[in-house]
Amino acid sequence: MGELLSETADGVIVNVRAAPRSSRAGLDGMVGDALKVRIRSAPVDGKANKELIEVLADAFGLPKSAVEFKSGETSKTKRLLLRGVTKETILSRL
């Protein structure tokens, strides 16, 4: 999948490994070259993806509209664009 963070003109693309059906929601360290994010929802009808966007937006102080899927919507391994932030901002909050 490449590196954890890729800076673009629009923001930063983050590699994420989703852990659905977790007992708690939030960031949970690294798994290989991806950020592990725990989410409570099951991966049914897009509920887990919606919660994933909420968790990332909250963790990095962004509005939900600033978090967008680039790939992997039906996979545990995903790439999301975080608009309006830099690599340094994200790394400082990990």
Task: Kindly label every feature range from the protein language model.
Residues M1-E54, A59-K64, E68-E73, K78-L94:
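Contiguous, often N-terminal, cationic amphipathic patches that form binding interfaces
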